Every structure is written in C-alpha cells, then in structure tokens.
Amino acid sequence: MKRLLTTFLLATMASPVLAFPVTVDSCGNQVTFDAPPERMVVHDINMADMAFALELQDAMVGVTGISGWYKTSAEFDQRRGDIPELAPKYPTMENLVAAQPDLFFAGWYYGMRPGGEVTPETLEAQGIKTLVLSESCIHLDQARPAASMDLLFDDVLRLGTVFGKQAEAQALVDGWTSQLETIRQSVPEGEATRVFLYDSGEDQPFTAGKYAITTAMIEAAGGTNVTGDMETSWGRTSWEAVAAANPEFLILLDYQGGDGAEGLLAFLKAHPVMSQTDAVKNENFVALRYEELTPGPANIAAIEKIAKAIKGGAS
C-alpha cells in the first residue's frame, strides 16, 4: 500500500493538474474559461495550423475559410482529418451556431469584420467565446506595438493556456526561438536587403505594413520591408512609393490558384515603374504560400527560406 501511495504521489508531482478557470487577453478584452473548450471552430489555414501544432483536433468541430481561397497541402489535409469545413470563406452566424461551438478562433479580416454579423459581441450573445488573432488587433486598437514574432508566440501560448496545454505550447515556442537564433547567426552582417512583399492588386499593390508579422519575418531573415512604415498590418500603397524604395528582393504570395507567383512576376516585369527596380530586373524573388506569411507555425521555416533566398540572390 505504501509503495502504491508513493507511486501515486510521484505521478501527481510529475503531471500537475492545470488549474481552471483561466483568463486570457483577446485584443484588450479579458476572456475567462472555466474549463478547456470542447467545440472550437477555427478560421483560416494559419490558425488551424496553430491548433494542429497543439494537437487540438479532438476539441475542434469545424474550420472555416479554407477552400474558398487556397489549395491545401497533403500534410494539412491529413492533420485536419474529418473536421468539417463550415464555410469556404467568411462564416455567417448561421454557419457557426449550427455547429454549436463554445469557441471561435478568428481575427479581424480573418473571418470577422468590424461591424459585421460575426463579431466577439454578437457571438457572446449566442454563448460563444472568441479568441482574436493578435496581429489583427491593430484594426481596432491603434496603440499596438510594431510587429514582432511575439505575434505568433503569444497566440500559441494563449491557446495552450486556454486548453490546458501550457507546457506543450512553451515547448513549441522554445523550439521556434532556437531555430530563429540559428537563422540569425547565418545572416551576413551589413546593410539589410530591401524587400517588397507582393500579395495582390494591379492598380495598387496589397502588401504588408508595420503591424504585419511578415515585416518581423523579413527582419529576422536579414531584410527590411520597404512598406514597413505603413500604419497598418495589411493594406494598399502606390506603385510609385514601392518603386522609389527600389526593392532588391521580392516575396511573391502564391495562393495556389491561377498562375501564382509566376503571374505576379510577369505583371511586375511589364509594369512601367516596377520593371525598373533591382529586384524585378534581376528576378530576385521567393514564392511563399499564404500560411507561411500570416501568423502560424509555418512562419519559422518561411523565414529560413527568405534568408537563404536573399543570400542566394534569387529564388
């Protein structure tokens, strides 16, 4: 009996019971959970990747905003398994309520629009809690700090707290931090390479600004974002402003539809001002997928791709 009691005590000490309730921040709002959610819906491929990294599939009853925009990878499909897609793009309240979720993990312009049908306030009225993607908070709170990799780290740690997986979340962040340090040590000293990210748009380019995690990723890879002074996360600027900065390197976003990155490059090569920039003339670019450039686990490998491509001078 004494041996059994000792074994029980040692097991209890090694695996402490995680205390609930827990309270976390969501764009300045405090959200309290009395127990881990059991019926979460996740919007967008990058946020689904966060949930999958913490192996939360058993607590998910749906995803939204996947097939309407992207072609997924075989790995994503395997990890998603039989979790249904409730809406191919932005969900309606009807889509969500029908799944009877207790949590919606989304963001502003990542499944929700300010003043729209689906917001934390309208969901709360239905008994559904919301965790808002930190990168997107800038759309309602102009006092946010400039982008850093904490946008990813903090969201994963928060998700771990909510689901009682703090240790697993911390292990992920520690591993990513170590990888980033290795990348940092590989970046040559000297002036940062001028980088332009081209997402979409012909009359005006849609790109990453001061509060987008992509700006922090570019910096971690040894570059500087030529549109990094835009007071937004994602937005539009002018071709003239981009060309005046004379980017030396391009990141082309490949949504896996149409002609992808090659089509973007062809457009830039035919453009009257962008065709004169060093990056376009030398065809120095790397093509990356959406989930690599929005907050999610794929960011880390993407930073390494950018760093290697910049050093190599071309994709």
Task: Show where each model-derived region lies.
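Bacterial Sec-exported substrate-binding components of ABC uptake systems
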Residues: K2-F8, A14-M50, T161-Y198, A309-S315
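Alpha-helical, coiled-coil/dimerization segments enriched in small aliphatic residues
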Residues: W69, T207-W234
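Structured C-terminal subdomain patch of bacterial secreted/periplasmic proteins
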Residues: A146-D155, T161, F249-S315
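Solvent-exposed loop/turn segments at secondary-structure junctions
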Residues: N46-D49, I66-W69, L103-F104, Y109-R113, ...
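Extracytoplasmic ligand-binding site segments that recognize negatively charged/polar headgroups
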Residues: Y110-V118, I128-R158, E191-I213, A261
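Short helix-initiation/N-cap motifs at beta->coil->alpha
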Residues: S26-G28, I83-E94, P114, M230-W239
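A short, structured surface patch at a secondary-structure boundary
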Residues: V42-A99, L103-F104, W108-M112, V226
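Extracytoplasmic/secreted envelope proteins and their assembly/folding machinery
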Residues: D34-P37, D44, A48-D49, M93, ...
